[in-house]
């Protein structure tokens, strides 16, 4: 989602956030990113990249991009060696897949966590059924 607040800033909201990338909130980690499906276009807009969670979810506070549009693919080229190990199910978000991109090829190296895995240990006491 792209939200423009005239005279203030432009927000780009992404599917992930604090649960799969806690480093910006915990350590002020800094990232670079680009619009992968339009990587050949010159940046002309400064945006704030925000995650899908309700608080403390600014991933990149200031990023120059080609004017973002809904449906664009935002690629963060590197997020750190321990990023996946630090991921959580905060707000009941499943963990995303991990994709290795090398020599022009992309391979899934960790599959996306299915919702069924998030709720498999949940129980409803018999007295409440």
Regions found by a protein language model. Name each.
Residues 1-129:
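Charged (often Lys/Glu-rich) extended helix/loop segments that serve as interaction or gating elements
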